[in-house]
Structure formats: structure tokens, C-alpha cells
């Protein structure tokens, strides 16, 4: 099946379906291998992502407002030139409650496009929850290329995420912070942490950078900064799983009401009790990929 990603975050298209867990789940749902094409008109399946120009965003919102009584197939063609015979699946790993991405959430909800987002069922019964960090977990039934795990250095192992932390003694007694910026509220979060911890900030473009993988750097530290950039219903990225995988105590984070992570991870004190992390794992259960496959099969590929 020929597939085109509209609004992909990189130039071009993925090299193969082994580049991400998402593509493997789509293949299972449709019962075919997918082949990526740079041609939108040749695609049988269009994966719609939000990384589009401001011009297209404004045009999309204008179409939603002035032609709100039109059918979804009409609007998809008017906005993106997606034809009625093409199958569509919207996928986003962004926080759709944030003002930068709210437009995309409004679009896919209003047009009732089949969608994979952070939103849990209680917020969006028409979509399916698919957190970004699932793409970096090693699942036995889905073999991915090594490139899929390049950003962190190793795959996230479910056994490790389900188990209590085992923290070696010989580690730097400080919080490791990996960040691209120190804009609000990131800077304020770190200032709060500095009242109780030594904080080592690694930031690209500064004198302190990391030349190895994130996993190798985190393994040197006892603590890791795991706060999200923004707050949204069900919005959880890879920060806490990556800290746990490296054997770091996660600090600086707040769990949202619809978290997949254990409620015991909630932090209410100025400084966490290190010993408590030996009593529980980060997760209660393994991610439910069967639910995702069934959703894609029913909403996208069912005649």
C-alpha cells in the first residue's frame, strides 16, 4: 500500500516501515506492507501530521469556519487536496491543548478524522490514545531498525519500566537536565529544583553539551529532570520513561489526571524520598497495542 505523510516533520518521507512503531501497527491493521511515496496523488493512505506552514494553518481554520456545513471529504480536498478515495489517518505527538497545536486538534475533531493522539478516551471518544514514547519501546512482535532508537541510544525495555528502580551507588548526586532552551517555564522549574538539588544543565549551543547518547549521559546521574514543556490532558512524552530506563530518579514532573504512569510517582514534597522508588515500577501495565491496531483497522480500513 502506497502511503504519503502530509505535514511530516522532516523533508521527504520515511525510508521504510521499520523506522517507527506506528508504521508497523498500520501494516498489521491493513494486512499489507506500506511503501512511502513523495507523491500525494499516488498515495492510497495519507497520514496527516501537523507540521505545516502558517499559510496552510490559516487556510484550514478559514475553511472550517466559512464552510463548516460541508462534508469532511469536501474540506479535506479543499484544504489538503486529499481525494475522497484516499484513506486518511491523523497522527500527532504534540500537546493539542497548547495554543501552537490547538488548530490541528480542532480540525481533526470537527472533521471526525480517524486519529491517534495523546488524548484518552474520556476526552476524545472518537480517537485512540497513542503516546509518543511508545515508539521507542522494544516490542517483541515488532522489529524496528536501529535508527528508530537513535535519539535516545537504546530501546526502552518494558521489563525495566515495569520494575522498581535499581540505582547504583556510584553516581553523580545531582539532577541531569537535557534541554534545547531555558525559556519560561523551563528556567523557573530549574530555579525551583536548585533549592534542593545540584542541577547540571546540558544544552545544545552552550559550553556544556553531551557528545554521547542521552542514555549514556543519564546513567552517570542519580536524578533526571522529567518535566514536560507544557500541560495537557494525557500529554506525556518520553522524558519520564527515559529517566527510568537509565536508572535515574525522576524529579520536577507532575502527573496529569489521565496519566499512564503510576500514581505513586506524584511528587508533593520539595524533595522526593529516594527510597520509595524501590517499591514500584513506572508502569502498572504494558501498552495496549492491540487496541491501537483494532482502531486503525475499524476506522481507516474497514469498507
Language model features by range: what are they?
Residues 1-281:
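Nucleotide-sugar donor-binding catalytic core of glycosyltransferases
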Residues 279, 283-302:
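C-terminal "capping" alpha-helix adjacent to the active site of nucleotide-linked donor transferases
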